């Protein structure tokens, strides 16, 4: 077998091993929600900013919103811990 081909095979195997190890660490890492906070005029609460959406998504308990074109800020904030 060619030395260069053998070296490429070793490097590929090492990359697969390190990638698999990194995935195992990611499974045990705590999940953090990455939603951005937004504020609408006249509201004191924080809302959830949805980027490039025309309306608030269903299933999150949103009851009101305001537009900050091209994004939308949805209320009430349905996730705790912020």
Curated annotation (Swiss-Prot):
Compartments where found: Secreted; Nematocyst
Record key words, sorted: Cleavage on pair of basic residues, Disulfide bond, Hypotensive agent, Ion channel impairing toxin, Nematocyst, Neurotoxin, Potassium channel impairing toxin, Secreted, Signal, Toxin, Voltage-gated potassium channel impairing toxin
Annotated tissue distribution: Weakly expressed in the ectodermal tissue from the distal and proximal tentacles, body wall, and oral disk.
Gene Ontology terms, MF aspect: ion channel inhibitor activity; potassium channel regulator activity; toxin activity
Residues annotated as signal peptide: 1-19
Cystine pairs: 38-73, 40-66, 56-74
Pro-peptide region(s): 20-31
GO biological process: one example: regulation of blood pressure
A GO cellular-component term linked to this record: nematocyst
Entries under Pfam families matching the protein: Defensin_4
Gene3D superfamilies, per the entry: Anthopleurin-A
Record has Lipid biosynthesis as a keyword: no
Function of the protein: Blocks Kv3 voltage-gated potassium channels. Reduces blood pressure.
Protein family membership: Belongs to the sea anemone type 3 (BDS) potassium channel toxin family.
Protein name: Kappa-actitoxin-Avd4j
Species of the source: Anemonia viridis
């Amino acid at each position: 077998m060619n030395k260069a081909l053998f070296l490429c095979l070793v490097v590929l195997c090492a990359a697969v091993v390190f990638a698999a190890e990194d995935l195992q660490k990611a499974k045990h890492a705590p999940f953090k929600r990455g939603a951005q906070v937004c504020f609408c005029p006249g509201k004191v609460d924080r809302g959830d900013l949805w980027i490039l959406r025309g309306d608030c998504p269903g299933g999150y308990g949103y009851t009101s919103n305001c537009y900050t074109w091209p994004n939308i800020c949805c209320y009430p904030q349905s996730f705790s811990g912020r």
